[in-house]
Amino acid sequence: MKQKILLALIAFISLVVLSSHNLFIKLKSFHLNPETEATIYLYNGTFDKSEAILARNRMKDVSLINPGEKRIHPNNSSWFEENNQTVLKFKTGKEGTGVLGVSTTSRVNNFTAESFIDNMKHEGLLQVLEDREKSEEATKPVRKKYSKHVKAIFQVGNTVSEDYKTVLGYPIELVPLNNPYDLKIGDELSMQLLIHGKPMAGEMVYASYNNQHGHAKDGSPLDAFKVLTDSGGIVKVKITTAGHWYFRTVNLIKSTENDADYISLSAAITFEITK
């Protein structure tokens, strides 16, 4: 009996931890050669380390747009697992700026009141906790339905193209408004947040690079930049260093569905600055 209780507790803790993971598409280098094999890695954990694989049956959409080509969907069987990373090999095309995207199915996690507080702190959603205090819901357990939607912008050769701004139609999506591979240190990158295809104002977007990220002792996120979207759903961030960059955000709303109390949509986009 004690062993069953312990196993159930471990499974519960694992679900809570996994729902707190950020998801990123990483490449060893986002600068690729034309007509060659390239490899992407799904990091399910932090920007530096993948702590769990992403099961292939959770991949609702996998999209690849090579420069100047139509959107294709690599088969789930093309993926394999390696060191807690989910890995995909693909072939690049001609020179230009390409896009990779992964969208997951939804999953419901059950939280105790205490574990939900930790989860919200981890995601930087403190307003949700304040609202729960005001509505006297702070001591109630929570069912959160979550999904993750991530992209990577990669550069093939030296010639840039307009493919970087392709909208994949995910429930939540970060879309660059200027090409990251046109930028140098000191330039500004504009990013638009779309939720169900519409610009979302007043949403917090985090951005950072390399190893400049983490969490404080209270669990709150520590990213290099923290910016609210304007009325057009846009944030602007000054590029301060070369390296691998990300923008990320989480949208959480009260659910009208019977199987969840909240709906969580998270988005991230990755790219590289070399100039």
Predicted regions and their residues:
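Bacterial Sec-dependent N-terminal signal peptides
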Residues: M1-N22
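Start-of-domain marker
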Residues: S20-N83, L88
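Beta-strand-rich domain onsets/edges
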Residues: H21-A38, N119, E123-L189, L194-E203, ...
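Short acidic/polar inter-strand loop motif in beta-rich domains
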Residues: K49, T105-A113, I253-D259
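Short amphipathic beta-strand segments in non-cytosolic proteins
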Residues: S63-R71, M204-K226
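Glycine-centered loop-to-beta-strand initiation motif
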Residues: N84-T86, P221-G243
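Short, aromatic- and glycine-rich surface loops/edge beta-strands on solvent-exposed regions
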Residues: G96-V108, H244-K254
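A cross-kingdom marker for long, charged
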Residues: I234-K275
